[in-house]
């Protein structure tokens, strides 16, 4: 087998880390001025993923579609770390593609996604729709990073049959601080 682990030089030792050690530096969007660097610890990143997993009742059978950049807390903590914490999986796309979004949801058997309001608007004004199986499989979509207009949310849910959960978070908190509840049965 050509697994990466088997090919790793055994003389290379991993560094000991603790939950309070710095894990990464991520910048805010700069909504209150100049973007600020936020240092996250390993535990803060795990907490950000955990709060998402709990709020959305993520299970090992869930698979997220990540179309957001991983240098954004929504992409990293919500659609990568949260699925891993819950035992699920995540499909990471190089970038958002309006023409491929629903096809990717179908192809990879996606059960949920997290996007920003602009993407919801692009999908709503796009030509493509999910097929019936994909609609049934999608438990919810998640909108964050900016306010989502009620009429846009309602139009999206009516057209695609996918409930949208609006959440609010901060780079500083490693994910959401508020989340609307899941629809009943989700």
Report residues per predicted region.
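Structural detector for helix-capping/boundary residues
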Residues: 2-3, 20, 42-43, 68, ...
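Short beta-strand->loop structural element characteristic of the AMP-binding/adenylate-forming
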Residues: 36-39, 66-67, 89-95, 165
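Conserved S/T- and glycine-rich ATP-binding loop of Class I adenylate-forming
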Residues: 22, 28-31, 64, 70, ...
């Amino acid at each position: 087998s050509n697994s990466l682990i088997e090919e790793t030089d055994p003389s290379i030792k991993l560094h000991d880390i603790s939950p309070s050690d710095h894990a990464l530096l991520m910048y805010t969007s700069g909504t209150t001025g100049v973007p600020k660097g936020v240092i996250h610890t390993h535990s803060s990143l795990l907490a950000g993923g955990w709060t998402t997993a709990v709020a959305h009742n993520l299970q090992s059978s869930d698979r997220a579609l990540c179309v957001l950049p991983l240098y954004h807390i929504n992409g990293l903590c919500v659609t990568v770390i949260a699925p891993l914490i819950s035992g699920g999986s995540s499909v990471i796309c190089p970038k958002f593609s309006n023409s491929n979004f629903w096809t990717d949801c179908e192809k990879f058997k996606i059960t949920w996604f997290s996007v920003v309001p602009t993407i919801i608007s692009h999908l709503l004004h796009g030509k493509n729709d999910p097929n019936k199986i994909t609609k049934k499989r999608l438990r919810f979509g998640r909108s964050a990073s900016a306010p989502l207009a009620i009429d846009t949310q309602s139009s999206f849910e009516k057209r695609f049959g996918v409930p949208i959960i609006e959440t609010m978070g901060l780079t500083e908190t490693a994910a959401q601080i508020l989340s609307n509840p899941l629809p009943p049965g989700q």
